[in-house]
Amino acid sequence: MTICIFAGTFNPIHEAHLKVAEYALKHYGFEKIIFIPAFIPPHKDINSDLAKHRFEMVKIATAYEPRFEVSDIEYKLGADGKKSYSLNTVKKIKELYRIDGKINFLIGTDAFEKIESWYKADELSKLVHFIVFQRGVKLTPKIGFDFEMAQMPFIDVSSTDLRKNHTENNNLKKVEEYIKKNGLYN
């Protein structure tokens, strides 16, 4: 089975995340995209109390596509308060799905631009083929990282903008309802 990881904080998940995953299914022929909401991301300061809500919102948002799966692997790996390092997640996914070669990993240019600062980035680079999507950040070459630039047009939407502006997301009404019902991002 050809799978691809799509890890992120998804705080909250939005249309651009879904468009990226749909594009990857169509243009790369993946049989499954595994969304992995970060439990305690090492690179962002977010309220860990929102973790269960972020996980639920990703489940709600991806329910329409049977080839989308949402994994709680980082919640299990971080149950004792450990940070969610991509290296540990990738190793566990490779083990669970019996993947011998490199695993595909969707990532935005904003995150990939900082990849060299990630936990054990050199070791991670040996396990992953990155598919990099434009996020409005100019990318400098990353020596030693197996990656390709996706040819998908840039979608100018971010979770930060959605939270700050409380923008209606017409394609994700159920997520919007979940946010309101649970009083998130007030």
Regions found by a protein language model. Name each.
Residues 1-186:
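Nucleotidyltransferase catalytic core that binds NTPs
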